[in-house]
């Protein structure tokens, strides 16, 4: 359906659709080929990442349930781990342990931090070796609903200010300390993940968002809220 490469992120998103067995086979072959062509030890980019195939979500489009899609995700993850020897983590609907189901939580530490993280008993992969592959890294495979990736540029080059706005709006919010106690302060938008980052090719900072349920938070609501939060911090959306 689409191939979307990004220069600053050094990342390409490939979207394809088809019958279940064909999609699973295509995904497996794509993961295999990415591992052959991409050397993660030399990779740099503005987007969080942990492997040559960073994440592989399966999405039920028609004639298949989320539960069935999750079962296929597990089958694909098992095959990747066994046949390719890549550490694989399940996420979203395919992950039974909800403490490990969030992509950003799994990917925390990124490629550079996973050599240590994978040794933690709490972060053993679901499939494949508990050894981080220097060239191919690891991958995350799961089943989820449709997601809208939406970026908003700001009239600033400050990643710090962009992150502050991202934390204002994202559902996870930020951790703050009150009376010596660390508490979570939720953001204003449900079903939204967001980070701030500087995009060299544009020369500006931006809010990079994933809208995980556009029935809960549609694009126009996310845009308006980012505008409000940016304005409150003396920043404009461009």
Regions found by a protein language model. Name each.
Residues 1-238:
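Long, contiguous binding/interaction regions
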């Amino acid at each position: 359906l689409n191939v979307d490469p990004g220069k600053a992120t050094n990342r390409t998103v490939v979207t394809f659709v088809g019958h279940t067995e064909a999609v699973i086979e295509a995904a497996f072959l794509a993961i295999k080929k990415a591992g052959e062509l991409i050397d993660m030890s030399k990779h740099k980019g503005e987007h969080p990442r942990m492997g040559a195939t960073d994440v592989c979500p399966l999405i039920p489009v028609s004639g298949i349930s989320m539960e069935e899609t999750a079962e296929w995700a597990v089958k694909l993850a098992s095959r990747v781990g066994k046949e390719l020897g890549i550490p694989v983590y399940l996420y979203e609907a395919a992950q039974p342990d909800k403490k490990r189901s969030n992509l950003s939580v799994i990917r925390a530490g990124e490629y550079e931090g996973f050599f240590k993280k994978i040794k933690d008993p709490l972060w053993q992969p679901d499939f494949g070796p508990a050894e981080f592959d220097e060239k191919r890294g690891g991958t995350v495979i799961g089943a989820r609903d449709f997601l809208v990736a939406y970026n908003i540029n700001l009239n600033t080059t400050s990643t710090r200010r962009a992150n502050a706005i991202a934390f204002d709006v994202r559902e996870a919010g930020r951790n703050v300390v009150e009376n010596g106690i660390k508490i979570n302060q939720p953001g204003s938008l449900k079903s939204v993940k967001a980070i701030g980052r500087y995009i060299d090719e544009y020369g500006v900072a931006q809010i990079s968002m994933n809208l995980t349920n556009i029935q809960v938070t549609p694009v126009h609501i996310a845009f308006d809220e980012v505008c409000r939060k940016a304005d409150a911090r003396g920043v404009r959306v461009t």
